[in-house]
Amino acid sequence: MKDLISNQLVKYLEARGVKHVFGLCGHTNIAVLAALSKSRKIKFVNTRHEQIAAHAADGYARATKKASVLLSHLSPGLTNAATGVANAALDSIPMVVIAGDVPTHYYGKHPHQEVNLHADASQYEIYRPFVKRVWRVDSPHLFPEIMEKAFTLAESGRPGPVLV
């Protein structure tokens, strides 16, 4: 039986000592929320808007001096959170933004809430101007390595947000 990426993510966050994940429920992150609900070490802070979640994650990182974690829904979730993430970037606040996505076989077919006028599944590109790095995980076996790189980059040099 294979281990789902959502379960791998929660195990990774627990091993890193993450205690809170901020975000909003959505159909593209429901598997992560299900995995988080089984964790005794991580509390999901459910907000009523993605911008609130981003600002809460920003404030949490400022208070704890550690990278915070923001869990976002695709498309409107990402655009709604952009102001809070950009604010963290301007103030050098470490944050790992994890965005849900639709299955790859839906790319370019305009599934529910896809913000994509060019049919290339690149909606994460809206974050590129203000985050340190953007990753799209196309190969599940690369996920653990990408998460490690994401946290390391968010907290090193001039700290700032990254998007996975």
Where are these regions (language model features)?
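N-terminal alpha/beta PP-like core and its mobile active-site loop of ThDP/TPP-dependent enzymes
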Residues: 1-164
